[in-house]
Amino acid sequence: MKRVFFFSFPLLVALNLYAKEVYVGPGPNAQERLQEALILIEEGDTLIIKSGNYKFEDGLSLDVDGVTVKGEGIDSTILDFKNQQSGAQGLLVTSDRVTLSDFSILDAKGDALKVIGAKGINMINLKTEWTGGPKSTNGAYGFYPVESEDVLIDGCVAIGASDAGIYVGQSKNIIVRNSVAQYNVAGIEIENSYYADVYNN
């Protein structure tokens, strides 16, 4: 017992020492710079998207475990997909132990934020919106975690989806709280899932 503790403690310290913060700011080639950061980020790192309006023509994706991606507020860090040409969603997450917080995803061609096959996904203080108002041509879902475990949606806002603002499907251990869904066909929908706690919305 003592030897296990002795060796594991320095290992934990070493992992924390190598964790870093990575910053991306607005400006030329924002699409390429942000996607590159999402690819190169390492477990334990935090990616900070600085305040600004970022315009994208392609969807973004994250497939690195154990990271945090955060903006500087839903009214300050704006990921704008109005001119999106490719990609089935604004942001696709396929990794475990991820926290996303404090930014907005606007006018995605398809679903705004899709999470698939994740274990441990925290979505905190995020907004998804289609700014042209409710339309059948808007993306189907604002928040769309499926086939996932340990899902937290907290303090989020979903506006204008052509189906559900917040949809959780084929998942388990789910909390949806303190969130707002407006002008969607359905507000919050939990389907084919286990152990869901939905409150204060």
Question: Which sequence ranges carry the predicted segments?
Answer:
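Positively charged n-region of N-terminal signal peptides that target proteins for export
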Residues: 1-4
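Bacterial N-terminal signal peptides
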Residues: 7-14
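Sec/Tat signal peptide C-region and signal peptidase I cleavage site
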Residues: 15-19
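Right-handed parallel beta-helix/beta-spiral solenoid domain characteristic of secreted/periplasmic
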Residues: 20-32, 46, 66-109
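Short, T/G/N/S-enriched strand-turn elements that build extracellular solenoid repeat scaffolds
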Residues: 32-40, 55-64, 69, 117
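Extracellular beta-strand/beta-solenoid scaffold signature
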Residues: 34-35, 57, 81-91, 107-114, ...
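Right-handed parallel beta-helix
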Residues: 44, 70-76, 97-107, 119-132, ...
